[in-house]
């Protein structure tokens, strides 16, 4: 049997789809092999050629299982450590999550085969990027969304990184799909022109890396200290460990008071209700002010509801030691808007909470803050804030960005995911936000990766994971507005709409030619 005939078998293509999907994980941190993104997408597009809609749909699902099964397996760490369920059930839950995310790649492959059954250039170079943009949007929106593992992030160190300040991560993903499609067309139809165009799309954006969309302000450079407490997740919400936790952060902070005007503690560094820590917060506020430093810290806010309706809890950031003396409730604060299902709130709460510890984790009853909130002000600087998972949401970060923003800030606690690849992927996505908006980004975490990122997405300084130490770094604020900061995703959606209309025209004309 020839290799060509062997590759026509559906089960062979399904297995290859799993392989090519898994290859895509190598494009992301900590591996950072950006060409793997093109290889993975090339595999998806080539394997769905000459397939019926049903066959292509299954291949798309298998490819998604390869990508998400390997790329988000870090979810298993938190489920197994804190979910309180048998190993078999933990594995099944991770498979179910990967299967759910694979529904979107399945939808992509099915629509592509249905609308464009022939291996034409417009199917591979135009229809594929358009449909991918649409299905990726759905993945980031349906059921609150999970826009993890977008291929554009793989280019943070790649040749297409210069696209980010123009069109954001979606624009990079769009071009990657077009390049992959052209390469498939070049191989399948033996058209050297398609390969040349693909190479041009890959290399022509390279000079864009040299454009500086921002203006540094070296005269305003400031020393910043970010404290990495390395508190074990098992101790995080233990009332018996509260005093020890606060003492760790205070002891690590003292040497930098008066030395660093801005000191940052990570997400829920103070693992208690804000009003219950009034004495401690007042003491820290006075201590900071006396030493001419200011502190940003994560904490839990509880707001009493009227008419005996209890409290609303918020995952918040507050500022201490700045211009105004601390007195609850301060106005200089940020409350997390995009909450993580099961981690910060539980859907169908009354039904699911009794079933297993996974659905009844500590502090999993948060409420949303406003979608758009004013920047934090500290030591004369404006910071656009995002807590943990929110830094993945490019549109939300952009919508909160202001022309007067000096720094981006994200605080996080990735202790849930242990020594897995999850924190590295999270870190990579944070770097993209700095590149898109042309601002330095300060990332303070409980156990890593704590880092300062430059306005071009470069790593200025970082400290190792799973260590208790402080990152001290001098960071220069920037001004200026990138095209992406000014226009957001609108240019990308206009491109998608125009090329989508062209795709529909070609599909309708192709069907009429048949008849």
From Swiss-Prot:
Pfam families named among the record's database cross-references: CN_hydrolase, LNT_N
Q: In what residue span(s) does the CN hydrolase domain sit?
A: 227-477
What is a single cellular component term in the Gene Ontology annotation?
plasma membrane
Q: In which pathway does it act?
A: Protein modification; lipoprotein biosynthesis (N-acyl transfer)
Compartments, as annotated in UniProt = Cell inner membrane
Record field: transmembrane: 14-34, 59-79, 91-111, 124-144, 163-183, 192-212, 488-508
EC number(s) on file: 2.3.1.269
Signal peptide (residue range)? none
- The protein's superkingdom reads Bacteria
Question: Could you tell me which InterPro entries the record lists for this protein?
Answer: Apolipo_AcylTrfase, C-N_Hydrolase, C-N_Hydrolase_sf, LNT_N
Q: Which UniProt keywords apply?
A: Acyltransferase, Cell inner membrane, Cell membrane, Membrane, Transferase, Transmembrane, Transmembrane helix
Membrane topology term reads: Multi-pass membrane protein
GO molecular-function terms, A-Z: N-acyltransferase activity
Q: Which GO terms describe its biological process?
A: lipoprotein biosynthetic process
Catalytic site residues?
A: 267, 336, 388
Major enzyme class: transferase
Q: Which HAMAP family match?
A: Lnt
Sum up the protein's function in the record's words: Catalyzes the phospholipid dependent N-acylation of the N-terminal cysteine of apolipoprotein, the last step in lipoprotein maturation.
Q: Which family does the similarity line name?
A: Belongs to the CN hydrolase family. Apolipoprotein N-acyltransferase subfamily.
Can you name this protein?
Answer: Apolipoprotein N-acyltransferase
Name its species.
Answer: Yersinia pestis
């Amino acid at each position: 049997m020839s290799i060509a005939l062997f590759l026509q078998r559906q089960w062979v293509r399904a297995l290859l789809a799993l392989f090519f999907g898994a290859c895509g994980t190598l494009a992301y941190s900590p591996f950072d092999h950006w060409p793997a993104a093109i290889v993975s997408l090339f595999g998806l597009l080539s394997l769905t050629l000459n397939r019926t809609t049903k066959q292509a749909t299954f291949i798309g699902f298998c490819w998604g299982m390869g990508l998400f099964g390997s790329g988000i397996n870090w979810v298993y760490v938190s489920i197994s450590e804190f979910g309180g369920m048998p190993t078999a059930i933990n594995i099944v839950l991770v498979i179910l999550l990967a299967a759910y995310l694979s529904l979107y790649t399945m939808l992509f492959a099915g629509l592509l085969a249905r609308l464009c059954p022939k291996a034409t250039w417009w199917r591979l170079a135009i229809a594929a990027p358009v449909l991918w943009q649409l299905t990726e949007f759905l993945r980031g929106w349906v059921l609150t969304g999970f826009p993890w593992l977008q291929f554009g992030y793989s280019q943070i160190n790649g040749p297409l990184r210069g696209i980010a300040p123009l069109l954001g991560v979606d624009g990079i993903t769009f071009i990657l799909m077009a390049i992959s499609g052209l390469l498939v067309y070049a191989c399948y139809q033996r058209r050297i022109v398609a390969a040349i165009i693909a190479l041009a799309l890959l290399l022509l954006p390279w000079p864009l890396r040299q454009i500086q969309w921002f203006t540094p302000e070296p005269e305003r450079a400031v020393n910043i200290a970010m404290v990495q407490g390395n508190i074990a997740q098992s101790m995080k919400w233990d009332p018996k460990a509260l005093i020890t936790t606060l003492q760790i952060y205070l002891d690590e902070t003292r040497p930098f008071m008066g030395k660093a005007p801005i000191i940052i503690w990570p997400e829920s560094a103070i693992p208690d209700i804000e009003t219950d820590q009034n004495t401690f917060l007042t003491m820290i506020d006075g201590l900071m002010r006396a030493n001419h430093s200011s502190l940003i810290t994560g904490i839990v806010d509880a707001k009493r509801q009227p008419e005996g309706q209890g409290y609303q809890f918020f995952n918040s950031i507050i500022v201490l030691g700045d211009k105004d003396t601390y007195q609850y409730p301060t106005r200089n604060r940020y409350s997390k808007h995009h909450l993580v299902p099961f981690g910060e709130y539980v859907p169908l709460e009354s039904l699911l909470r009794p079933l297993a510890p996974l659905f009844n984790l500590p502090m999993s009853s948060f409420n949303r803050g406003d979608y758009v909130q004013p920047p934090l002000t500290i030591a004369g600087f404006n910071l656009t804030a995002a807590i943990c998972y929110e830094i993945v949401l490019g549109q939300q970060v952009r919508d909160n960005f202001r022309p007067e923003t000096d720094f981006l800030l994200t605080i996080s606690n990735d202790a849930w995911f242990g020594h897995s690849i999850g924190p590295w992927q999270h870190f990579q996505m944070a770097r993209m936000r700095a590149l898109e908006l042309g601002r330095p980004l300060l990332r303070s975490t409980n156990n890593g990766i704590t880092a300062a990122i430059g306005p071009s997405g470069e790593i200025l300084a970082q400290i190792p994971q799973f260590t208790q130490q402080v990152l001290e770094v001098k960071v220069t604020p920037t001004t200026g507005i990138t095209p992406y900061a000014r226009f957001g995703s609108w240019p990308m959606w206009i491109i998608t709409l125009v090329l989508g209309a062209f795709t529909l025209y070609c599909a309708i004309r192709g069907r009429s030619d048949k008849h």
